[in-house]
UniProtKB/Swiss-Prot annotation:
It comes from Saccharomyces cerevisiae (strain ATCC 204508 / S288c) (Baker's yeast). This is RNA polymerase I-specific transcription initiation factor RRN7. The keyword Zinc applies. Keywords: DNA-binding, Metal-binding, Nucleus, Transcription, Transcription regulation, Zinc, Zinc-finger. Although it shares weak sequence similarity with SUA7/TFIIB, displays a similar subdomain organization as SUA7/TFIIB, with a N-terminal zinc finger, a connecting region (composed of B-reader and B-linker regions), followed by 2 cyclin folds. The gene is RRN7.
């Protein structure tokens, strides 16, 4: 029987003892309580030559962790993890059935509230936005509650949160569109990816793994998934019956014209084409869909119809102009400006969306980035993306479930490759270089177009000779291809979907002309 050794508090039945000794290989406090999981033996053979009898001894090894508490040196990491999991499962157990669905709805609402708070504080959305989003969410809950319990289907995903936010902004006629929400979630500014990490710890432990995976937002919406979800949400709550369903078409047109640095008159050209086909621009409203199995035609979505009108207007105006008002050199210069690599907030955001967007053909663009674009992407990866995938190194509140030993090991791991900006003296990540804003970049792009129109006025006073039609047609085709490639990424649709929508709108316009 060994002597007493001072150690951690026993705690069994509120036992205050700190004195421990070994009785029959088991660590026992002075009041007779046995410490669980702390029996260990040293089975190493002694020097048989030195011990004539060849006796094999078994010695008890006492080790302590970072806090000075006793622990077994022979317990593997998996055994320690199992002990911790058994202790945590005593407090929280996975919910099943109806209780699990209620907790999922509660968690979904918690994430939605965080997203709304971010939009109001960071993007300066009006305070009424929260009230409208709350009403839409309550209508969804009422629809779910009205279903029979035997056939209850939640039909909620992380894209459902974006749908609710988009519907609320549409009702308030805010100049915010799906491309904005896609950019915010892909750049990890708005809570979306790994959104389950912001839930309280007790909720995450009790929530079944199936629901946790839903709240993780594994990939960004693509191939028109967001538009289909918006249409389903509209049909679920009969959005048009209670809310304003007209999209801010003028704001979207202005956004497209400025993004492509087109002359301002293209805004009015496109608006006239829309009014010719739709009779009234206010007829562009959200589409409601109730059938989950059939997605319907992509041309039913109002925003995609505006994109199609915009592309058709550019094609028709430049094709019938015949080098009079918009010369061939200007078309070539505009195409070059769209492909030129500029380090602006918009270009960096589009590069990030291309990386996050699951589209294989865009992967070749990564090798064409400039050094500034690459550094900006790496900075975003460090500051925005990595914290959503793993708990931050300095965020101790987010890692309360980790033991002190695990925290110490994590710090040592991060010190192998320090990412601290202050430790880098080479100046490679220096932020002193000025980054052009969207307005400054737009002013430069418009300034470069001025000489082409001035020279065109001088040429009009002379004898006019029509430019080479095949060369002009090819240049227009390249311009439309570059504009379409940007729209595919910004609005998260496929090339086939955009082609189908443009074809249907074109046929409808030609049929109306006849």
């Amino acid at each position: 029987m060994s002597t007493f050794i001072r150690g951690p508090i026993c705690g069994t039945d509120n036992c205050p003892s700190r004195l421990w000794r070994i009785i029959d290989g088991r660590r026992t406090c002075q009041y007779g309580h046995v410490m669980e999981g702390d029996v260990e033996f040293n089975d190493d053979e002694d020097d048989l030559n030195g011990l004539g009898a060849g006796v094999i001894t078994r010695r008890l090894n006492l080790t302590t962790n970072a806090t000075g508490s006793f622990q077994s040196s022979q317990l593997t990491n998996s055994q320690l993890l199992q002990q911790q999991q058994r202790q945590s499962h005593k407090k929280f157990k996975k919910l099943i059935g109806h209780e699990a669905k209620l907790l999922f709805l509660k968690s979904f609402q918690f994430i939605l509230k965080r997203q709304i708070r971010w939009l109001i504080t960071e993007m300066r959305f009006p305070k009424e936005f929260e009230h409208v989003a709350k009403i839409i969410w309550l209508k969804i809950l009422k629809t779910i509650n009205d279903q029979p319990q035997e056939e209850l289907k939640l039909q909620l995903h992380m894209t459902s949160t974006i749908s609710i936010l988009y519907l609320a902004s549409t009702h308030l006629s805010l100049p915010v569109y799906t491309c904005d929400y896609i950019k915010w979630i892909c750049t990890a500014k708005m809570p979306y990816f790994q959104a389950s990490e912001i839930l309280p710890k007790s909720w995450r432990i009790q929530l079944p793994n199936y629901y946790v995976s839903i709240l993780e937002g594994s990939i960004s919406p693509f191939n028109g998934q967001l538009y289909n979800k918006i249409a389903l949400t509209c049909g679920m709550i009969h959005f048009k019956e209670f809310f304003n369903s007209e999209i801010s078409c003028q704001g979207l047109l202005l956004k497209l014209v400025m993004q492509c640095a087109l002359p301002p008159e293209f805004y009015f050209y496109t608006k006239q084409v829309i009014e010719f086909e739709e009779t009234d621009i206010r007829n562009l409203t959200l589409w409601e869909r109730t059938d989950e199995r059939h997605t319907g035609r992509v041309s039913n979505h109002a925003e995609l119809r505006v994109l199609s009108y915009f592309m058709l207007t550019i094609n028709w105006m430049l094709s019938f102009d015949r080098d009079r008002q918009y010369p061939l050199k200007w078309i070539l210069s505009l195409t070059e400006s769209l492909t030129q690599r500029t380090t602006t907030s918009e270009s960096i955001g589009r590069n990030i969306v291309k990386v996050v967007y699951p589209d294989k053909p865009t992967s070749s663009d990564y090798f064409q980035w400039s050094e500034e674009e690459t550094l900006e992407f790496l900075k975003w990866m460090e500051k925005q993306f990595l914290p959503t995938q793993t708990k931050s190194l300095h965020n101790e509140n987010g890692s309360m479930e980790m033991t002190i030993d695990q925290k110490i090991a994590r710090r040592k791991l991060y010190k192998i490759f320090p990412l601290d900006r202050e430790a880098n003296h080479d100046g490679e990540f220096n932020d002193s270089t000025h980054q052009l804003t969207f307005i400054e970049d737009l002013q430069e792009r418009y300034a470069k177009q001025t000489p082409f129109f001035e020279s065109n006025k001088i040429r009009d006073s002379l004898n006019y000779q029509e430019a080479n039609p095949p060369a002009r047609k090819e240049a227009i085709g390249r311009l439309l291809t570059h504009i379409a490639s940007q729209l595919l990424v910004d609005f998260a649709i496929s090339k086939e979907q955009l082609k189908d929508c443009i074809s249907r709108i074109k046929n409808a316009c030609l049929h109306r002309m006849n």
